[in-house]
Amino acid sequence: MTTNSVLQKYGTQLLFADHATDFAAAPDTPAHSLIIGTPTDVEMDLSELANAAMWQSAKTATLADTGTAWPIEWVFGACMEGAATPTAGGTYDFYWNASPSATAGTGNSGGCSGLNATYTAGGLDQLLFIGSLVCVANVINISSNVGTVVLPHLYGSLVIDNNSGVAMVDTDADNIHFTMTPIIPDVQAAA
C-alpha cells in the first residue's frame, strides 16, 4: 500500500516593523533576524510604546495567496528591543485583530482602528490571543515561535500589550520586528 506524506511549506511572511523610519530591509544585527524570504511589510512603530501600554499596527493588505484563498495557520515570531533591560519574567503579549475589511476603520474587533497608533480601547478579550514573549534580563528578547494563530479573515492588525517593565527603545529601533509566517500543508505524491 502506498501512502502520501503531508509536509509543510512556508508562504510569504508578514513583517511588522517601523519601515518608515528605523527598520531597513532587515534588522541592524543579522543574528536577530526572523525573516524568511521576501516578506510583505506592515507598518508598526513602537518608539512611543511605554511600559504598561498597548500599540496596534496598521491593517494588513490581503493575506490571500490567490484570489480569496489564504493560509489558515500562521506562526508568530518577535524580536523586541527595550530602552533598558526588562524585568525577567515580564511579558510582551500579542493579539490579532481579525477583520473582513481592507479599510482601516471598518470591521475591526476590540475597538482597533486599523492604524499604526496607540491602542487604548480595552477590548483585548475581543481579539485573538497569539501568545506571550516572556522576557529574560536582556535588552533584546527574541522568540521565533511566540505562538500560532488561525486567521478567520483576509485582513487584520497586530496589537501588543507591553508588560515587560520597560519602554521600547525610542530611537534607532532597528532590531524591533515581528513576523507572521503562514504554514501551508504540502501533500507529497506517494512513492
Regions found by a protein language model. Give the residues of each.
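Predominantly extracellular/luminal cell-surface or secreted proteins
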Residues: 93-105, 161
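Noncatalytic modules at the cell exterior or secretory-pathway interfaces
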Residues: 69-78, 149-170
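Extended, solvent-exposed segments with strong compositional bias
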Residues: 27-38, 118-149
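Short coil-to-beta strand junction motifs in C2/discoidin
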Residues: 86-94
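C-terminal interaction-tip segments
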Residues: 2-19, 161-191
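N-terminal leader/pro-regions and domain N-caps
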Residues: 1-49
